[in-house]
A protein has these predicted regions:
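C-terminal segments of enzyme domains that contribute to small-molecule binding surfaces
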Residues: 2-16, 20, 71-92, 136-178
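Left-handed beta-helix
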Residues: 15, 20-21, 26-27, 32-33, ...
Length: 178
């Protein structure tokens, strides 16, 4: 794994975090308890802060970045991710806020200033445009993201299950690879 400082800002990584050797974590990044970071993930906190809540999993090839302070984005946009979030393979999160117990589908993109409230599912390939808010308790799909329907009880339970499953899987990888 590559974990490195940028501009004298060092990642803060809880000792329980598992990071695949091919992942990259750079700069002003905080990874909470039992976070797992899978192959080819890039978490680049070079121009603003990235905070990842406990028990979140960031799956293969996902990209997490933020927005710099500049004339087109005064103050920039940090990336904040809540607890028990599943970030699917090759998803891209950029300068947005993600609540608790959220599933971001494979290849989904969530852009600057978007807010995803708690207990939301975002379908594979969905585009959440800048500044959009996704209300709690719904499935969103499409480009741009549209509310499809309320989540069913078993889907809300799956949000927790997915997070816990990835903790077990990361622990297994840690044991197998040493």
């Amino acid at each position: 794994m590559t974990v490195r400082a940028y501009d004298n800002q060092h990642p803060e990584i809880d000792e329980s975090v598992w990071i695949d050797p091919s992942a990259v974590v750079i700069g002003k990044v905080t990874l909470g308890r039992e976070v797992s970071v899978w192959p080819q993930v890039v978490i680049r906190g070079d121009v603003n802060t990235i905070t990842v809540g406990s028990q979140t999993n960031i799956q293969d090839g996902a990209i997490l970045h933020c927005t710099h302070d500049g004339p087109y984005s005064p103050g920039g946009k940090a990336l904040t991710i809540g607890e028990r979030v599943t970030i699917g393979h090759q998803a891209c999160l950029h300068g947005c806020t993600i609540g608790q117990e959220v599933l971001i589908g494979i290849g989904a993109t969530v852009l600057d200033g978007a807010v995803v409230e708690d207990q939301v599912m975002i379908g594979a390939g969905t585009l959440v445009p800048p500044g959009k808010t996704l209300e709690s308790g719904y499935l969103y799909v499409g480009s741009p993201a549209k509310m499809a329907r309320p989540l069913k009880d078993h889907e809300k339970e799956f949000l927790k299950y997915s997070a816990l499953h990835y903790i077990r899987l990361a622990n297994n990888h840690r044991e197998v690879t040493g």
